[in-house]
């Protein structure tokens, strides 16, 4: 019986590693970006999306798909796609993280492979988690979306810089109740302090949350308040504050207020802890209210080989 378990376990690890390798091979042809307006799912549903230290923190192969579109008919309004996959291998976490955003004529790319290590502190599920991602960053101007002088040499110069290697680093303390984390994204820009880099780029991210359990059985509710602090180049730093409500791990409700004077709301369902779907709506910032109608985001999470 022990022998069969080993075979099953080895087969599971092999399948998951093959899937991650396939995703890693494909991600270098995919487009993505670090963001001023992050996906709402990063706060609770998929924290690996923002912090590489969360890769492989939980059992199984976790696959997350996201799509976000601004609720507006304005030409060139932003749309975003994201996919992450992470897998736990003993104390090691492996993952791939791809984020794609197009706004107007600008398309940005960030595609990363992640290695994380989870150090147990005791038998009470307390861990110190460290993660690093490395991959490519690509930014291009789509000539078909340019309203202006197509021969402007600055456009060609911008496109000719091609893809650049970049990385993210994250750390987190996690337990059954308290989570504390910090992230330095876009390490290349952080180290080189490149003045030519455009605005709308993440500089840092930090967050703390605490889980509160109330009720038992069918009346059990887990409430997780969270505060986050983000730095974005060219903008004032942003505070996020809100909470997630988990009803018996079947129904989720969340809300976050952002100091940019916008708010995010989400609701979703979880089927047998293996398939979750959530929808999010984010109001526009104060600067855009009246000219746009906010954004809608749909997130799908599947947990395999658990």
Region spans (language model):
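Bacterial Sec-dependent N-terminal signal peptides
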Residues: 1-37, 243, 294, 304-306
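Subset of outer-membrane beta-barrel
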Residues: 35-306
